[in-house]
C-alpha cells in the first residue's frame, strides 16, 4: 500500500522551524519524501542547523531567515524559496511568540501597557500568518493545489488570563484561516488549524522539575497525563499537509492531550 502521508511531489515551507515544534514538522516533511523543505526562522543559525540535519539525512532543505511580521521580509523569503524549488505546495504558519523575548512591558497587564508591547504578540502570531498566507496563495491558486496549516493555541480558543493579547492574536489567526478556507476551496486549497496546549520544551521541563507541585497541577489539566511532544503536533500537521487530507478544510484540530474536548 502506498504511503498516504507521503510528501513526494510537494515542497513545504515551515515558519519558526529552527527549534521545537517547527523543527519536528520540517523533519517530518523530509522523512516523508518532500521534494524540498524551506526551513524558516528569525535566527538564521537555528534554521541552518535544521536544514543541515535534513540534508545530512538525504533530504533536500534550505534555510531562509525572515521576520514573518515584516511583509517585505516575507515576500523576499518566498521569492527565494520559489527560485530554489519552483513552488510552495504546503505552508505551515508555525512561528509564534508567547513572550520568550518580549518587549520590556509585555508581562505587565495589557491595560497598563500600550501598542508597542502589544505588537510583540500581534506581529508574529497574527500579522505573520496573514503575511505568509498572502505570499503563498497566488502560486497555489495558479496551480490549483495547496495546503495551509496554522498553529494556534488553547489560549486562542478558550482564553488565558494574563495572555490577552497573545490569545487574541491566535484567535484572530483562526478566524482568518476559516475565511481563507471558505474562499480558497474553489481553487483546491485546504486551510486548517492545529490547536496545541502546553509543550514539553526543554525550558518548560526544567521549570516543572524545579517545582513538582506546580507541575502536578498543570498535568492534572490534561486527560493524558503528560505535556505535548513536538512529534505529536508534527504528526497532525503532516496529515493536513499531505494528500490524505484532500477533503478536509476549515477545521481546528486540538492536539492537547485532552485539555479540551468536544465529544
Where are these regions (language model features)?
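Conserved glycine-rich Rossmann-like NAD(P)H-binding loop of the short-chain dehydrogenase/reductase
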Residues: 34-49
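Active-site helix of classical SDR
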Residues: 133, 169, 177
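Canonical Rossmann dinucleotide-binding motif of NAD(H)/NADP(H)-dependent dehydrogenases/reductases
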Residues: 4-38
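Substrate-binding pocket helix/loop in short-chain dehydrogenase/reductase
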Residues: 102-119, 218
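Alpha-helical segment proximal to the catalytic Tyr-Lys
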Residues: 138, 182-183, 246
Amino acid at each position: 500500500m502506498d504511503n498516504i502521508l507521503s510528501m513526494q511531489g510537494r515542497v513545504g515551507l515551515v515558519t519558526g522551524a529552527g527549534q521545537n515544534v517547527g523543527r519536528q514538522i520540517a523533519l517530518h516533511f523530509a522523512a516523508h519524501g518532500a521534494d524540498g523543505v524551506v526551513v524558516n526562522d528569525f535566527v538564521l543559525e537555528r534554521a541552518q542547523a535544521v536544514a543541515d540535519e535534513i540534508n545530512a539525512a538525504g533530504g533536500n532543505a534550505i534555510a531562509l531567515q525572515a521576520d514573518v511580521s515584516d511583509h517585505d521580509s516575507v515576500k523576499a523569503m518566498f521569492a527565494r524559496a520559489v527560485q530554489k524549488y519552483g513552488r510552495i505546495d504546503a505552508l505551515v504558519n508555525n512561528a509564534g511568540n508567547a513572550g520568550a523575548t518580549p518587549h520590556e512591558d509585555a508581562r505587565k497587564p495589557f491595560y497598563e501597557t500600550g501598542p508597542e508591547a502589544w505588537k510583540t504578540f500581534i506581529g508574529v502570531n497574527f500579522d505573520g500568518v496573514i503575511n505568509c498566507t498572502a505570499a503563498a496563495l497566488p502560486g497555489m491558486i495558479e496551480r490549483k493545489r495547496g495546503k495551509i496549516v496554522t498553529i494556534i493555541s488553547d489560549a486562542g480558543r478558550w482564553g488565558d488570563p494574563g495572555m490577552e493579547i497573545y490569545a487574541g492574536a491566535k484567535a484572530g489567526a483562526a478566524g482568518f484561516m476559516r475565511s481563507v478556507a471558505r474562499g480558497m476551496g474553489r481553487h483546491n486549497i485546504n486551510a486548517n488549524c492545529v490547536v496545541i496546549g502546553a509543550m514539553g520544551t526543554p525550558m518548560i521541563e526544567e521549570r516543572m522539575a524545579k517545582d513538582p507541585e506546580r507541575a502536578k497541577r498543570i498535568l492534572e489539566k490534561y486527560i493524558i497525563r503528560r505535556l505535548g511532544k513536538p512529534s505529536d503536533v508534527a504528526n497532525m500537521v503532516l496529515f493536513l499537509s499531505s494528500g490524505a487530507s484532500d477533503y478536509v478544510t476549515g477545521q481546528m484540530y486540538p492536539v492537547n492531550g485532552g485539555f479540551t474536548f468536544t465529544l
